[in-house]
Each structure stands twice: as C-alpha cells, then as structure tokens.
Amino acid sequence: MSFKDLRDFLNHLEKKGQLKRITHPVDPAYEMTEISDRTLRAGGPALLFENPIGYDIPVLTNLFGTAERVAMGMGREQVKELREVGQWLAYLKEPEPPKGFKDALDKLPVFKQVLNMPVKRLRKAACQEVVWQGEEVDLDKIPVMSCWQDDVAPLLTWGLTITRGPNKKRQNLGIYRQQKIAKNKIIMRWLAHRGGALDLRDWMEKYPGKPFPVSVAFGADPATILGAVTPVPDTLSEYAFAGLLRGSKTEVVKSASNDLEIPVSAEIVLEGYIDPNEYADEGPYGDHTGYYNEKEKHHVFTITHITMRKEPIYHSTYTGRPPDEPAVLGVALNEVFVPILQKQFPEIEDFYLPPEGCSYRMAVVTMKKQYPGHAKRVMMGVWSFLRQFMYTKYVVVCDESVNARDWDDVVKAMTENMNPILDSLFIESTPIDSLDFASPVAGLGSKMGLDATIKWEAELALQGATTSTEFASQIGFDVNALKAVHPLISDIYVPGVASGQFMVVKINKTHAGQCKEVVESLWQVESVKQRNKFIVVCDDDVKADDWHDIIWAITTRMDPARDTLKIDGSKSCSAKLVFDATNKYSEEITREWGKPIKKDPKLVAKVDALWQEFGIL
C-alpha cells in the first residue's frame, strides 16, 4: 500500500489504531519529548499534538516509533518484507542482465517498478500555498521542540535537506539535525562524508565564497522521508528510490527561491543558502547515544523563504538513549541491509545491528565459513562495503548456526570458539563518529573485530592450540565469593551459557585506573585465572544481567584499542580480554567526556499526573 502524502499515511495509521491525537495543551519545550519517549518505549502509537502551547501548528512525533510503522511507510505489511527492498537496492547497485527468457520474466516486476522511478514535475503545489519571505521569515512561529534540559537551543530534526553539487543532475536528500540560532538562521550539522557536505565542498571549490542554495522539507510522504535514510546507490536519487517504494513517480516542484526541486507532499519548506564563510558553534545536545555531545563548528543556513500548506503539520522527533526513533529506524533498515551485504558476500547468513549499540556501533554477522581466516575477510567487508558502517566500532562474526539476535547465543560462541587474544583484531586511527566522545580525538578512533567462528585446523595450528576451550575445566566458581574479592565490586553476573568464561563486573568507580585494580584482584582467584576469557567492567548505573545495558556501555564508553586489557595465555592461565566499559576520568582520556542525559524529576512528575488523561496506551 502506498501513500500520496503524510496526511494519507496518518489517516491509515489512525484507522489501524497507530495514531493518537492529543488535544490537551502540551509544551514543545521538554514535555513532548517526555511523552514521546514513554510512548516509544512502550511500543505505542504515533502522536499528533494538536494544541502545542504557544503555537497554532500541530506537532507530529513518533511517526516511525515502531519497526512495523517503518515497514508500512515503505509500503510493506511486515518488517520481514523489507528484505525485498534490500534485494531491489542490491540489484540496482549491481544489476545483472537476464540470463534467458524465464529470468527476464522473473525480473519483470523489478523492471516495472524501475519505470516509476523518474520524478514528475508540477508547476503548483500545496506546500507553497503560504509563503513567508524577508522579514516575514520567523522560526519562532513554528513549534520547534526543545528535547532535553541541557540542550543549548531548540532543534529541528526531521527536515529533508535538499542539495545539488555543481554540474550534477542528481539532487541529494539527507536528514541532518539543525540548531535554531535566530528566527531566520539554523546550524547545519552534517558529517563530512554525507551527501550534503560533499555537495557543499564541491560548490566551494568551483564557486569560492558564493552562497550555496539549500531547501529543507518537513512532513513529506513516508516513502520520500524513508528514502532519505536508506542506503541508496550513489547513482540513484532518493526521489527515484521513493518512487520505487511507492509504486508511482515522486511529484516535485521547483523551490520558490532557487532551482532545487522539493517534494510536492511536504508540509513546510525552508529555503535559503549557506555562506561558505559563516560558521557557528553547534551543541551541546542530548543525542542518540544517551549523552550530550561536544560543541563543534558547522555551517550556518540562512533562511530567505518559508513555504507551507494552509494549516500545516510540523514533523519532529527527539534523540536520546536507545531505544529512540533513530534506533527503531535502525532495526527496520537492518532488514534492508542484509540482502545488500549478501549480494557482495553470499556467505553471510544474517547481519544484525543491535539498537542498544546506538544503531550502528556494533554489528553481529553470521556466516557460512568456507576457509581459514574467512571471518576476518567478512569483518573488513562490513567496514568497507557500505559507508553506513564506516563508523561501526565492533564486528562480531559467528557461524551460521548462531542466532545473531540472541546475546546468550553470541556469548556462547565467543567463549567456546575464541582465543581472546589471537582471535581479536584491532585497527587504530580509523574514521569514527564525531559524536563518539570515547575516541581519542574527534572523528578518529579504533575498531575491533571478534572471530567467534569454529576454528579450522590451520587456524588452530597457527595458534599452537589443540582446542579453543582447553581451559574450560570444571573448577569451582563461587560468584558470591568473587564479589568479596575487591571492595569496589557491587555485582557480578556470569551468563549460564558461558561456563564461567564470560563475566560482567559492576564497580563503584571513584578514580582512574580502578578497572585494572579490580580485574587484577579477580585474576588471583584460581577459577578465574584458569577458566575466564572475557570480563566486562561497568559502572553502577548498568544492570549487570541486562544485555541492552551492557552493550550500550561497551559501545559508548570504550575506544576498543585503548580500553581493552589483554593477557596472553600460558600453561596456568587462559588468554583474557577485559572490556573497560566504565566512564573515564580525565587522567584516562584526551578529550571531554560525555555528560549523560538525565530527566527532570519535576517534568516527570507533571507528565505522571497527566498520563491517564492523555489515554495513549
């Protein structure tokens, strides 16, 4: 099923009980975030705040707050059907000619869909019924959300930023967060490898100092929105892909003030330019990691025109500790990634980006292993094949029999099949998300690969081992006794599947270096010395038996190379890795550490008192 615009999609969701209209007045400053966060974590509906305090424009949040709604937006009934979308993209990335008449017939549905890819250009559009220009331009009239108490300013989040590089026919659509700094200015935070930033770079090289035209569309139809967050091939425009998803051509209209084409289905459009010489400090903001990011300088977008429908809807979201809407999108798009990766690496059985790993910082891959060292080839492939994974810090590779989406199964494979030292790969000074405060410097850090596949004879020979589980003897293992080994230990969790070879240790850290102090005390215990392979050390704010908490701590509080302690094995001691997933003190790091997002107790109490009245769940 396809949808011509956002309102068509909302009507469909409402009929299915997947949209809740909130008529009670709600403040876009913080209150909408608290309500949206509770709703998303409960798997609840999209929310339409019809009476935002101080504004006449309703606010839509949590539109893609479940993977099922993402699938609906892509014209699918079930999340598993998104693999078909991935198959299309894999085909478009590397098309193969038909091998015969039957194969041509099999490919016919794809060819028919491809015919819907070119855009349809219109002269008029509802998104230009109202036009503000010059002094009329005023972002203060739009209910831009303030999400967290320590955010520096209101934040625009769901705009489709439309750019075109010089001498390029294809436009680029991207979604970048945008800090409001004046009634006609926002900061455009885009990473250097993203399409909009690349278009600006090319423009600055060809037209030094000249304004770079930009348009930003809010509230387009779901296929166009989701097309902007999907890994489409570089040769394919997001508008064309949206047409493929929708089954009909994407309708566009020329911007009121520049030559960029905007989606006819949009609710609100910002138009203007970026002065290549104008920068401003962006942030800090509470981000999808669950922390506030550092300040960074980014280009300023000056708005000369705002166009909109009559009685428009403002589409917004928040980001915070997962799960949030970006994490949910990651879960759904995970199904799109699988066929694309399998096209290049047919040996891959499954691929999983756990949402607790901030959508992309950790990947688990299962594969049909075919030769010694095969797992390392797959690791390299994940890091290099799609630019979406250039910031992935951890890649765990397991055999096809392992359930990539079950942490107990993955940990069991790690403990049974790995020599922690020899089967781990570290690569330093690689591209890392600039929001990753655990990296030594902004944008540059390390990656880690873990080969948890069953080892072949050649691999064991190289390791000088006869089995990969030689230290898994049945020596007594008393968790309560281990807790008493060091006064900083507050809890220890040993997964039942790990036979004592994997443990999570919670400590009450008060100064630098205490992780090493604790594990060195544990290593003096004979059972730990001989049997244990992996220890994860976390702070007291992490639940030791909750994999979501554990993986979140590992992916946000570690630089793999710096924060992994290594012990080579010997006849009396098993090889060991310690993941120091604690918050770091200034003596342990070289840059400012992230500040965790914390909710305002007064705001929580206020929403508690009104919760039943909202009737959301």
From Swiss-Prot:
Coiled coil: none
EC primary class: lyase
Membrane topology, from the record: Peripheral membrane protein
Region (Unknown insert): 460-588
Chief place where the protein resides: membrane
Alphabetical list of Pfam families matching this protein: UbiD, UbiD_C, UbiD_N
GO MF, any single term: 3-octaprenyl-4-hydroxybenzoate carboxy-lyase activity
Keyword Transcription: no
Places the protein is found: Cell membrane
GO biological process terms, semicolon-separated: ubiquinone biosynthetic process
Reported cofactor(s): a divalent metal cation
Description of how the protein assembles with itself and partners: Homohexamer.
Family note: Belongs to the UbiD family.
Function (record text): Catalyzes the decarboxylation of 3-octaprenyl-4-hydroxy benzoate to 2-octaprenylphenol.
Entry protein name: 3-octaprenyl-4-hydroxybenzoate carboxy-lyase
Organism annotation: Vibrio vulnificus (strain YJ016)
